[in-house]
């Protein structure tokens, strides 16, 4: 039996897959890694940008000022990306998707290429 947490993870993964599939090109995607610099240095998704979750409110305007643009955030497990999503939504960004952990996001990107 699938517990509620796993069901939520599956739902978010399916939402991410559908949203990314709708994107015109991979270059059009704004993917932000919100992990620490040390985690970033150990590996990150291709084309991802790096902003630590606690700095996302101050630094997001360097990447986009379009509050309607779709923004994907990820971390190691999905917890910090959930915090980053909340911060961005409080700033008025309306299309923010928590892509969860690095492995989840990487699996999808690999399937596209």
Language-model regions, residue ranges each:
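Short, surface-exposed ligand- or partner-binding patches at beta-edge/loop junctions that are enriched
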Residues: 74
């Amino acid at each position: 039996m699938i517990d509620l947490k796993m069901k939520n993870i599956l739902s978010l993964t399916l939402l991410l897959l559908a949203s990314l599939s709708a994107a015109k090109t991979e270059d059009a995607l704004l993917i932000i890694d919100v992990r620490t610099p040390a985690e970033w240095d150990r590996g990150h998704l291709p084309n991802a940008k790096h902003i630590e979750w606690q700095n996302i409110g101050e630094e997001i305007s360097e990447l986009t000022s379009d509050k309607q643009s779709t923004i994907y955030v990820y971390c190691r497990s999905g917890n910090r990306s959930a915090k980053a999503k909340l911060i961005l939504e409080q700033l008025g960004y309306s299309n923010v998707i928590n892509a969860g952990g690095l492995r989840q996001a990487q699996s999808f990107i690999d399937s596209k290429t």
